[in-house]
Amino acid sequence: MKYQPLYDRVLVEPIQNDEAHGKILIPDTAKEKPTEGIVVMVGGGYRNDKGDITPLKVKKGDTIVYTKWAGTEIKLESKDYVVIKESDILLVKS
């Protein structure tokens, strides 16, 4: 992939929660947005108050939980991703 998130942004591959709801088929428009994902790429960091670059705490491969309305959904090379700010990440799973 030839893309790179900028600053404090993180490229995330959402983890779809495809739990069965009995025999009811739920259309895509009614499904909950995923709030878990795998970090694919991270930006270079953000500038702190002193002007220094502060690297991000998350890294490629981390499984994260992020806020429901975080980021921008994009499609790259036929795959769905979300670009979010590190501040929208609530948890890193270990």
Swiss-Prot record:
CDD domains (alphabetical): cpn10
Judging by the UniProt lineage, the source's domain of life is Bacteria
Q: Which UniProt keywords apply?
A: Chaperone, Cytoplasm
Q: Where in the cell is it found?
A: Cytoplasm
Give an example GO biological process.
Answer: chaperone cofactor-dependent protein refolding
The cellular component terms of Gene Ontology attached to this UniProt record, alphabetical and capped at eight, are: cytoplasm
Which InterPro entries would you find in this protein's record? Chaperonin_GroES (IPR020818), Chaperonin_GroES_sf (IPR037124), Chaprnonin_Cpn10_CS (IPR018369), GroES-like_sf (IPR011032)
GO MF annotation list? ATP binding; metal ion binding; protein folding chaperone; protein-folding chaperone binding; unfolded protein binding
Q: Name where it mostly resides.
A: cytoplasm
Disulfide bridges in this chain? none
Q: Which HAMAP family match?
A: CH10
Kindly give the NCBIfam families that the UniProt entry links to this protein.
PRK00364.2-2 (NF001531), PRK00364.2-4 (NF001533)
The UniProt similarity line reads: Belongs to the GroES chaperonin family.
- What is known about what this protein does? Together with the chaperonin GroEL, plays an essential role in assisting protein folding. The GroEL-GroES system forms a nano-cage that allows encapsulation of the non-native substrate proteins and provides a physical environment optimized to promote and accelerate protein folding. GroES binds to the apical surface of the GroEL ring, thereby capping the opening of the GroEL channel.
User: How does the record describe its quaternary structure?
Assistant: Heptamer of 7 subunits arranged in a ring. Interacts with the chaperonin GroEL.
**Name of the protein described by the UniProt record:** Co-chaperonin GroES
Organism, per UniProt?
Orientia tsutsugamushi (Rickettsia tsutsugamushi)
Query: What is the gene called?
Result: groES
